[in-house]
């Protein structure tokens, strides 16, 4: 069975870079990233590996909602300047890059889902909990910095909803880290309570007459924003990839299928 290790490039590299005392020391960054990747390979024993990078194009989410991820700090100039050399180094040690046009998340999600549907196993290396919406038994998520898999049961308990409701929760309460708005006046706690009662957004919005007037008014006025927020939070899992798995094989090429 194929086991694909999919590394969220900037999620890994920026965290490592932030811990380097001298922001201009790209040699230290390259060394630390190499050590991290070697450790990942040793722990997970994948048949295939790639590291996926964000691109420079404006994402479809930003076009849809200009405030998406507004206020995020830009990449430090030394890191931006040193990234191509780091990517070349990783290539020299058989860790091939995939370059997304805009956000890496959709490419990672698509690659993981296509791998799982082809009866393979996908391990996503990222601290981004947005990947938890990929509800498939052959997809897991590894937190390199805490050296553990994302525990979905703990996350469900923390959020107060089932995994199948994660996107509905974001649609209602939003996500401040990514500037996904949600519905004004509906926080994570009240959103979770509503979803525990009504289970789905559709059932909730069809039951507004059963709610108190104040809350029903908030929900009715925020319905369009909830739809927008759901769309912004939802990962794309059907992008055309047009890659051949043999290019990402660990320890040399082998005859393996193409992922469209």
UniProtKB/Swiss-Prot annotation:
Keywords: DNA-binding, Endonuclease, Hydrolase, Magnesium, Metal-binding, Nuclease, Potassium. GO terms for molecular function: 5'-3' exonuclease activity; 5'-flap endonuclease activity; DNA binding; magnesium ion binding; potassium ion binding. Its cofactor is Mg(2+); K(+). Residues 185-190 are annotated as: Interaction with DNA. Pfam families: 5_3_exonuc, 5_3_exonuc_N. Residues 164-254 form the 5'-3' exonuclease domain. Binds 2 Mg(2+) per subunit. Only one magnesium ion has a direct interaction with the protein, the other interactions are indirect. Mg(2+) binds at residue 105. K(+) binds at residues 172-173, 181, 183, 186. CDD domains: H3TH_53EXO, PIN_53EXO. The keyword Metal-binding applies. GO terms for biological process: DNA replication, Okazaki fragment processing. Its EC number is 3.1.-.-. The keyword Lipid metabolism does not apply. Has flap endonuclease activity. During DNA replication, flap endonucleases cleave the 5'-overhanging flap structure that is generated by displacement synthesis when DNA polymerase encounters the 5'-end of a downstream Okazaki fragment. Belongs to the Xni family. HAMAP family: Xni. This is Flap endonuclease Xni.
